[in-house]
Amino acid sequence: LLGDMRMIKSPEEIVVMKQAGEIAGAMMQAAEDALGEGRPEYEAALAVINAGTRKAAGFLTDKGWKAFISPMIHNLQIMQSGTDTSMVHRRASVKPLAKGDPVYFCFCNMAQFKQYKLGFDRMFFIKELSDEAAEVQQTAIDAQQEAIAAMRPGVTAGSVAEAANDVYREPG
């Protein structure tokens, strides 16, 4: 029952959801802007927190009960780069970024505002994208599209996964 009720959003909730989206966008842009050859990973994580907090503060007031809503964006940034990109849920470190490094950000545990949480990930590359990295990214996109196309009522999760896995197997 509660799940069904939560599917219907009030105009106020829709405004908050849009604000949360703007905050998430500011966080993602700050992450990209902070990346650079030789810069440590944690600098990008700090930029994400600062940008999200500043954007959230712009939607708040110091009047009435709403004065008690904190703009603070916090948590440990999930971030992997270079040869550590496959280390799922690794946190930002002092490791310097190198030219050509893939840099993966997961904002799922950080992008939240007024109890609305947004889950999204982004991948960036330092200065350049190798042909091999571009092929890997395109394969992932193609597999995702096949999985989406396979989704329909009554289809098992296993068959959806198999549709994606077929795409992954093609290049070898």
Where are these regions (language model features)?
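Active-site neighborhoods and metal-handling regions in enzymes and metal-associated proteins
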Residues: 1-172
